[in-house]
Swiss-Prot record:
GO terms for molecular function: ATP binding; GMP synthase activity. Keywords: ATP-binding, Glutamine amidotransferase, GMP biosynthesis, Ligase, Nucleotide-binding, Purine biosynthesis. Catalyzes the synthesis of GMP from XMP. Homodimer. It comes from Teredinibacter turnerae (strain ATCC 39867 / T7901). Its EC number is 6.3.5.2. InterPro entries: Class_I_gatase-like, GATASE, GMP_synth_C, GMP_synth_GATase, GMP_synthase, GMPS_ATP_PPase_dom, NAD/GMP_synthase, Rossmann-like_a/b/a_fold. This is GMP synthase [glutamine-hydrolyzing]. It catalyses: XMP + L-glutamine + ATP + H2O = GMP + L-glutamate + AMP + diphosphate + 2 H(+). Gene3D superfamilies: 3.30.300.10, 3.40.50.880, HUPs. Residues 9-207 form the Glutamine amidotransferase type-1 domain.
Length: 525
């Protein structure tokens, strides 16, 4: 590769905002690599990182509180453009000689800011024009404090009636502050604001493209593993599928995938995985049929957490057994992605993103004799999907709805039995097929059937029957943190219900789950 796609990079210092990952994603959508680091990076680390631009995120603290976080001095000494967002603007103002105070009017939600003066950041950007011909922007606010006096060298960029200084700039130094959140989709011109900042003001080249990312990842994998053999646990999910396709292109037959069929997969999923990777792409895949083992270990277990642990531990047991049969494997590949890395790394101050244990970071058995290769660890999920398409994976596979690690094990309430799994597989397949036929599959974020271990009376012809209940679940969400139930058309639900009851002998009733998250979770267990 002639150009280093990481050389053009934007550093995002995180002050604890819930939107920080969105900032990184927006910058990358513009075509420039960005990374999130905790706000307490040292001056030396920042200079060594050598960013083309720096963004200071929002955060929950108050600049007016004594011990609240500040940006490292190097941020303002490096000579690169700086954009402060919300808290980031406030700490920039305070550190450079301005004043911040708590506001009597807190602004949360939609607002309209009036653009003041000329600035490279807002050039030719507007949503509306006011009666005086001034440019107005529709934005998203979320703040209690506000800047009441700008540093002497700054000019006013934007204002609202309750926040007279909603944006400020020191054009000569290329320092900018905005009180609103351009990273949130409710700020309609957010992408253009970031384009101006990153491409025009900072002069970054848009090298961060799917084709370049694939080429760079292949180079790095080859350099790292050399002629060694690599092992990958292939689940059929998006992340592991993209890793398989990427590694196969990079190192060919040095890769062996182990696909553990636990008997808790969707209808024909195991065969589809084998057809796609082994048959069509020529990837070496070992299929371990472990349905009987998983079901025997789950016998009599009702507690969801216990089921998850048993399924996870049994997977490792089967994977280890298959791995032991392979000779001279040195590397274990994993589908770790960037949000996993962020969640598992927190600054010593605890102001960065919350630490939580994640299945792909640090959850490996202590005695595993492999070194790790994680080719997706810099990428967000939407980027993983894009490079999946770049690698030639089918759209329907890359944009398939999320499926839980324990599979149908957490969609069968209570004890897992083969009879229940078989019924659920059929019901789920009918639901998904009809969603696709009605062009509703990609309008929902996640849709699936749930097996309820309760019996209900039904009538077929003249005969009374007493059979199981299936619940359908479909939700719409942006981030999976909150979700609303999908308002599917009644005729579609009627068709799905009729098919399930008529085509599956063990089901007498179909219900539709109309619970939103919160308070309900998306999965039932």
């Amino acid at each position: 590769m002639t150009q280093n796609i990481h050389s053009q990079r934007v550093l995002i210092l995180d002050f604890g905002s819930q939107y920080t990952q969105l900032i990184a994603r927006r910058i990358r959508e513009v075509g420039v690599f960005s990374e999130i680091r905790a706000f307490d990076m040292t001056d030396e680390e920042i200079r060594e990182y050598n960013p083309k631009a720096i963004i200071l995120s929002g955060g929950p603290e108050s600049v007016t509180a004594g011990a609240s976080p500040r940006a490292p001095e190097a941020v303002f000494e490096l000579g690169v453009p700086v954009l402060g967002i919300c808290y980031g603007m406030q700490t920039m103002a305070e550190q450079l000689g301005g004043r911040v105070q708590s506001s009597e009017v807190r602004e949360f939600g939609y607002a309209q800011v009036r653009v003041a003066g000329e600035s490279a950041l807002f050039r030719d950007i507007k949503d509306h024009v006011d009666s005086d011909g001034g440019a107005l922007l529709d934005v998203w606010m979320s703040h209690g404090d506000k800047v009441i006096a700008m540093p002497d060298t700054f000019s006013l960029l934007a204002s609202t009636p309750s926040c007279p200084i909603a944006g400020m700039s020191w054009e000569e130094k290329r320092f900018y502050g905005v009180q609103f959140h351009p990273e949130v989709t409710h700020t309609l011109q957010g992408k253009r604001i970031f384009e101006h900042f990153v491409l025009e003001i900072a002069g970054c080249e848009p090298l961060w493209t799917p084709a370049n990312i694939v080429e760079d990842a292949i180079e790095r994998v080859r350099e790292k593993v050399g002629s060694d053999k690599v092992l990958l646990g292939l689940s059929g999910g998006v992340d592991s599928s993209v890793v398989a396709a990427l590694l196969h292109r990079a190192i060919g037959d040095q890769l062996t995938c182990v696909f553990v069929d636990n008997g808790l997969l969707r209808k024909q999923e195991g065969d589809q995985v084998m057809d796609m990777f082994a048959k069509n792409m020529g990837v070496k895949v070992v299929r371990a049929d472990a349905e009987d083992l998983f079901l025997s270990k789950l016998h009599g277990i009702n507690d969801p957490e216990q089921k998850r642990k048993i399924i996870g531990n049994t997977f490792i047991e089967v994977f280890d057994t298959e791995a032991a049969k392979l000779q001279n494997v040195k590397w274990l590949a994993q589908g770790t992605i960037y949000p996993d890395v962020i969640e598992s790394a927190a600054s010593k101050t605890g102001k960065a993103h919350v630490i939580k244990s994640h299945h792909n970071v640090g959850g490996l058995p202590e005695d595993m004799q492999f070194e790790l290769v994680e080719p997706l660890r810099e990428l967000f999920k939407d980027e993983v999907r894009k490079i999946g398409l770049e690698l030639g994976l089918p759209y329907d596979m890359v944009y398939r709805h999320p499926f839980p690690g324990p599979g149908l094990g957490v969609r069968i309430l209570g004890e897992v039995k083969k009879e229940y799994a078989d019924i659920l597989r059929e019901a789920d397949a009918i639901f998904i097929e009809e969603l696709r036929n009605a062009d509703w599959y990609h309008k929902t974020s996640q849709a699936f059937a749930v097996f309820l271990p309760v019996k209900s009376v039904g009538v077929v012809g003249d005969a009374r029957r007493y059979e199981w209940v299936i619940s359908l679940r479909a939700v719409e969400t942006v981030d999976f943190m909150t979700a609303r139930w999908a308002h599917l058309p009644y005729d579609l639900l009627e068709k799905v219900s009729n098919r399930i009851i008529n085509e599956i002998s063990g089901v007498s009733r179909v219900a539709y789950d109309v619970s939103s998250k919160p308070p309900a979770t998306i999965e039932w267990e």
